[in-house]
Regions:
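Conserved beta-strand signature within the Rossmann-like core of class I S-adenosyl-L-methionine
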Residues: 324-331
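Conserved class I S-adenosyl-L-methionine
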Residues: 52-64
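A short glycine-rich, Lys/Arg-flanked "PGG" loop and its adjoining helix->strand segment in the class I
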Residues: 308-323
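SAM/dcSAM-binding transferase cores
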Residues: 2-5, 361-429
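Conserved Class I S-adenosyl-L-methionine
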Residues: 337-358
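A short acidic, Gly/Pro-enriched loop at the edge of an enzyme's catalytic core
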Residues: 286-294
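Class I S-adenosyl-L-methionine-dependent methyltransferase module
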Residues: 69-275, 282
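Class I SAM-dependent methyltransferase Rossmann-like catalytic core
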Residues: 3-51, 65-77
Length: 429
């Protein structure tokens, strides 16, 4: 049975806990906020979007916050702002299905025509040049991604079935972070793309069990769930009443799906190339020959998942990065930064304006792309024992073996410890 341990982070987006890694997938202060601040805001979109092709590699896709934030940011800040106002579009919504509005659904094509513009009038299409390759070895988790809610208000973290001390102070914190949510159209886009390219998405029983579990209902979008159910619908034999209700359900959600499809076409969002790869990222990239403009590296912490933080893995990423591309990650570990440098990257800090401090690392081939270089102290830290990086010579080692090898190397190293280095640096500066 698949283990699923969700909770609400302080910005109203869903965070997850992994029993396998005894770690959280996202910052408890705000899962969606973290995605924006570490993977979206550091990118110069005004320059970036002038490229003929935009290829994004999302490593450890999870429930998709980084890819969805990327698409949502472009959609809200470039597409919708530049969309022609030639036609007046009236928003109209129908109530959830009841017996008193089923005829309106059956006969009311005029609702559909009035609520959606039938013509594509946005001439500068950004989305047809965007390609996203999302990698995660947890297929069920990535299948859940389009169902996940964001921007939930007045939420309560009740019935949490795990204990993780590091987040207790955050999930019980009354101070919430204000942040925009992912537009429902982006979630529907991801739903459609996964459905189109995954053979078992709509018929996966484990996924079906999870999204229909009442315990988790507060975390999932009811509209996406309804559309999903309409894809799975089968008549109930010998039960006309249930069959009738299912038919009503399908009429409503198929209408809703058509409405979403119209909006995708209107903004040309359907032109995005989205590929989901459910496998070991090392294996996927060894068989991949694409060059990427942006790489989001969002694996579990280096000590929990060192196979995706090794020197050899960064060498592999170097081979897959465009000359003016960027790698973005939340990690500021000296061992990770040292591995990046030896792998041929220029590295710098990711500045968090809200917190007024550095909260991540950016790597590039071009030094001119580094806006916030490392300080003298940080550069010196790379030469201490803390800067000894992980090794995975054949890119197929287990995490335990990689950790053990680094532990032995650190123990046998003549390098100064990070604590002694800090003391020495403070005395001389």
């Amino acid at each position: 049975m698949y283990e699923f341990h969700p909770y609400f982070t302080n910005d109203g987006s869903v965070g997850l806990y992994s029993t396998d890694f005894n770690d959280i997938y996202h910052s408890a202060t705000g899962a969606l906020t973290e995605a924006y601040e570490k993977f979206i805001y550091p990118v110069d979109f005004n320059t970036f979007l002038h490229k003929d092709k935009i290829k994004v590699l999302d490593i450890c896709y999870g429930i998709g916050y980084n890819s969805k934030s990327f698409l949502n940011f472009i959609f809200e800040n470039y597409c919708r702002k530049n969309f022609s106002k030639k036609y007046s579009l009236t928003k109209r919504y129908i109530d959830k299905i009841h017996t008193n509005n089923i005829l309106q659904l059956l006969l009311g094509n005029f609702i559909y025509k009035n609520s959606i513009c039938n013509e594509q009038i946005y001439t500068d299409n950004i989305f047809d040049k965007i390609s996203i390759t999302a990698i995660d070895n947890d297929k069920i988790l990535s299948y859940i991604s389009p169902f996940i809610k964001t921007g939930v208000r007045n939420f309560k973290n009740v019935n949490i079935d795990f204990k993780y001390n590091a987040i207790d102070k955050f999930i019980n914190n009354k101070d919430k972070i204000s942040h925009p949510k992912i537009n429902e159209l982006i979630n529907y886009l991801i739903f459609e793309k996964i459905s189109e390219n995954s053979n078992d998405f709509t018929q996966n029983e484990e996924l079906n069990r999870l999204i229909n579990n009442p315990t988790f209902s507060q975390y999932f979008d009811s509209n996406i769930k309804g559309i999903y159910k309409s894809y799975r619908y089968k008549p109930y034999k010998n039960n006309p009443r249930r069959d009738y209700l299912a038919i009503l359900h399908n009429i409503y959600y198929r209408y809703l799906s058509k409405r979403y499809k119209k909006r995708l076409k209107r903004y040309q969002l359907q032109d995005i190339n989205f590929k989901l790869k459910n496998d070991d990222a090392r294996k996927v990239l060894l068989e991949d020959y694409n060059l990427y403009n942006l790489i989001f590296l969002d694996a579990f912490t280096p000590s929990k998942c060192p196979c995706l933080w090794s020197y050899e893995f960064f060498k592999l990423l170097n081979e897959h990065l465009e000359g003016d591309g960027l790698i973005l990650t939340y990690s500021t570990s000296a061992s990770i930064r040292a591995a990046m440098v030896v792998a041929g990257f220029e590295i710098g800090n990711i500045y968090n304006e809200r917190l007024n401090r550095f909260t991540g690392t950016v790597a590039a081939k071009n030094k001119n792309q580094i806006k916030y270089p490392l300080s003298e102290y940080d550069l010196g830290l790379l030469k201490t024992k803390a800067g000894i990086f992980y090794r995975d010579e054949n890119l197929n080692s287990l995490n335990g073996a990689i950790n053990e090898a680094r532990k032995i190397e650190v123990e046998n190293s003549n390098r100064i410890s990070s604590s002694h280095y800090k003391k020495y640096f403070n005395q001389n500066h």
